[in-house]
Design a protein with these regions (language model features):
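A ubiquitous short alpha-helical element
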Residues: 2-8, 69-74, 94-100
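Short runs of predominantly hydrophobic/aromatic residues within well-ordered alpha helices
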Residues: 19, 31-39, 82, 86, ...
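Charged alpha-helical initiation segments
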Residues: 1-37
Length: 123
């Protein structure tokens, strides 16, 4: 299956747009940008899925998780809310499994390195 076929399988229009932005960055060799936008896609897509679960299926746990993290975002809480969000959807509603969670943790580390590069004096 080629990439275009895979892109068509992305259900949410907003998520598809985020993915296409990330993929475009990758195709143009803007790798740091691709990583940052891919991380943004992951977090936004989780919110979109939680909204869908809550609004369409009246999933109260999804609603609780949404409310909790929306409040944290509005408070501009410097805690690691993004990773906490992923851990919560993994443990409470099993939207992702433990292997995917570890991959997302790694992606977050890459995102931080891409968005906030470390400059050493000797290099």
């Amino acid at each position: 299956m080629n990439m275009e076929d895979l892109v068509e399988q992305i259900y949410d229009k907003r998520s598809k747009e985020y993915f296409l932005e990330s993929y475009s960055s990758y195709q143009n060799s803007f790798y740091r940008s691709a990583i940052v936008t891919l991380w943004n896609l992951v977090i936004c897509d989780v919110f979109f899925k939680l909204e869908k679960l809550h609004d369409t299926y009246d999933d109260s746990v999804a609603g609780e998780i949404l409310d909790k993290f929306i409040k944290l975002m509005k408070q501009n809480n410097p805690t690691n809310w993004e990773l906490n969000l992923l851990e919560e959807i993994s443990s409470r509603i099993h939207l992702i499994d433990s292997i995917e969670l570890e991959k997302f943790k790694h992606l977050q580390k890459l995102r931080h390195l891409s968005a906030h590069p470390i400059i050493e004096k000797d290099n």
